[in-house]
């Protein structure tokens, strides 16, 4: 969802990443690992649910969908990539820009769904 000032994004995460988000006070995403050059929140909850349920649960025993808002003016500098079907849109943020991305999050990151 997008208003003129903020864009709502979703991020499917496993339990380890969720714990790091919690430790940040629900205000930022943790740095990417060296083998993860892109941070890619997704553009809709349906796609985030699919990843959390179908990928995170088998990989780590549980999956969570997080929802957060980011300043539209900032988010618009990144490309939206379609990686499959109609719902499979991701915002591709280079890992080295994640700190700036985090500083443009409005409010807190919230968990909207949990899968086990």
Residue map of PLM features:
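Conserved NAD+-utilizing ADP-ribose enzyme module
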Residues: 1-39, 46-116
């Amino acid at each position: 969802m997008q208003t003129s000032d903020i864009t709502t994004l979703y991020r499917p995460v496993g339990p380890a990443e969720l714990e790091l988000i919690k430790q940040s006070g629900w205000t930022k995403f943790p740095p990417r690992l060296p083998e993860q050059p892109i941070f890619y929140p997704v553009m809709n909850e349906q796609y985030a649910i699919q990843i959390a349920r179908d990928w995170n649960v088998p990989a780590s025993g549980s999956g969570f969908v997080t929802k957060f808002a980011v300043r539209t003016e900032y988010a618009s500098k990144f490309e939206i990539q379609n990686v499959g079907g109609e719902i499979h849109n991701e915002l591709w943020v280079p890992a080295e820009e994640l700190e700036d991305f985090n500083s443009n999050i409005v409010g807190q990151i919230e968990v909207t769904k949990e899968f086990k």
